[in-house]
Amino acid sequence: MSKKRRNRHKKEAQEPQFDFDEAKELTVGQAIRKNEEVEAGVLPEDSILDKYVKQHRDEIEADKFATRQYKKEEFVETQSLDDLIQEMREAVEKSEASSEEVPSSEDILLPLPLDDEEQGLDPLLLDDENPTEMTEEVEEEQNLSRLDQEDSEKKSKKGFILTVLALVSVIICVSAYYVYRQVARSTKEIETSQSTTANQSDVDDFNTLYDAFYTNSNKTALKNSQFDKLSQLKTLLDKLEGSREHTLAKSKYDSLATQIKAIQDVNAQFEKPAIVDGVLDTNAKAKSDAKFTDIKTGNTELDKVLDKAISLGKSQQTSTSSSSSSQTSSSSSSQASSNTTSEPKPSSSNETRSSRSEVNMGLSSAGVAVQRSASRVAYNQSAIDDSNNSAWDFADGVLEQILATSRSRGYITGDQYILERVNIVNGNGYYNLYKPDGTYLFTLNCKTGYFVGNGAGHADDLDY
């Protein structure tokens, strides 16, 4: 047996002792573990495996020599303590090779009390800390780190789950709102469709009654007999309130009401209706207190008839006033002639010539480029040369009324105009009225007072 082995056996045979001074510098836990090592015979130079075997020798021996029962075909195999230690040592060495190094510090331990024969031995260097203790602390730290990591993972998972739940909630809310909007829109469309369908019969009734107001499909002339049914049309219009057809129906009603009012206003100035079913009655007589003003309805054909009716009424008013003046003048003349000597009576031709000579023909056309080509009535030189024809005689007040109208419309100023004969048609003499510069204004009938030009907005058709 080598000297080293003999020394080892001697050390193992020594009575274990724990120095008190050393114990003072240790904690209670460290002192307890140190005492257990001393009692187990652990030496400073022992490896971790040797320390483990010495501290758990009884358990190892008990496990090794415990009797185990097997089946008959099995047999008991005994392993020696040295082989077991060798295997455990190899396992520990592998574990130490793969694990991280654990720093340790070494302090010089005071020598334990020895027997007399061992007094000459040098002090032993003992580890200040037990490797087993350090291993346990490292494992504890690893366990704590693992717990912290698990807690962090749990918190992370919890946060992820909460985020997912929040997103799911938002998606559910958005989906619910979208479904609500779709349902609301569908409901509104259904209600609108039902409303439109329900009002279709009212629309048909309105259009039927509206068409009945006109004499033709072009809706240019109105039936006077339908005027009192305008209130019924208004009732049907009110039924369409809120529907999409109401706007169009309202515009139709407003236009119709305007036309009816215009016709009624003009007819009210005559002793009997002058416009009946869109046609002018030229035999209608204007009232003595009639007041005529230009009226526009937007219906071109109706506006023409209204203009003719207004012109007719104004000409009648002028004729009436002129006749009254003539009668007054005649009475005065008769009274004066009764007090004087009777004289030869002038010929009728001279009276006619005198009457025509009193017509104010305005300015002379000499040297002026008159727009005769724009005349609405063709020039007839033979008729113009027949100057003694009574067709050229103006009816009482006709010329004065026409000139007054022209002045009010701004066509002429004062007597600044040119008046020329044009033609005789159906016993009526037609004249052209021009501006002083020769600009054509219109052609007039000296008997009826009807006049027509080329401008828009007034009469467009000739009266023959």
UniProtKB/Swiss-Prot annotation:
Q: Where is the composition biased (Basic residues)?
A: 1-11
Chief location: membrane
Record keywords, A-Z: Cell cycle, Cell division, Cell membrane, Membrane, Phosphoprotein, Transmembrane, Transmembrane helix
Topological domain spans for side Extracellular: 180-464
In this chain, composition skew of type Acidic residues spans 114-142
Membrane-spanning regions, if any?
A: 159-179
- Where are the Phosphothreonine residues found in this chain? 67, 78
Please indicate which superkingdom the organism of origin belongs to: Bacteria
What GO terms describe the biological role, i.e. biological process, of this protein? Answer: cell division
Q: How does it sit in the membrane?
A: Single-pass membrane protein
Give me the ranges of the annotated region Disordered: 1-21, 91-150, 314-365
Q: What happens when the gene is disrupted?
A: Deletion mutant exhibits a variety of aberrant cell shapes and sizes, is more sensitive to heat stress and shows lower survival after exposure to oxidative stress. Mutants show severe cell division defects, with cells dividing asymmetrically, generating daughter cells of unequal size. Cells have mispositioned division septa and form grape-like clusters. They exhibit severe alterations of FtsZ ring morphology and localization. FtsA and other cell division proteins are also mislocalized.
Show the ranges annotated as biased composition (Low complexity). 100-113, 315-352
InterPro entries, per the entry: MapZ, MapZ_C2, MapZ_EC1
Q: Which residues lie on this side of the membrane: Cytoplasmic?
A: 1-158
Tell me the compartments it is located in. Cell membrane
**Modifications made to the protein after synthesis:** Phosphorylated on Thr residues by StkP. Both phosphorylated and non-phosphorylated forms of MapZ are required for proper Z-ring formation and dynamics. Phosphorylation probably occurs during the predivisional stage.
- What's a Pfam family this protein contains? MapZ_EC1
Record's GO cellular component, any one? Answer: plasma membrane
Q: Which family does it belong to?
A: Belongs to the MapZ family.
**HAMAP family documented for this protein:** MapZ
Q: What remark about domains does the record contain?
A: The N-terminal domain is required for interaction with FtsZ. The C-terminal domain efficiently binds peptidoglycan and is required for septal localization. Both domains are required for MapZ cellular function.
What does the record give as the function of this protein? Early cell division protein that marks the future cell division site and supports proper FtsZ ring positioning.
Q: How does it assemble?
A: Interacts with FtsZ.
The molecule here is called Mid-cell-anchored protein Z
Q: Which gene encodes it?
A: mapZ
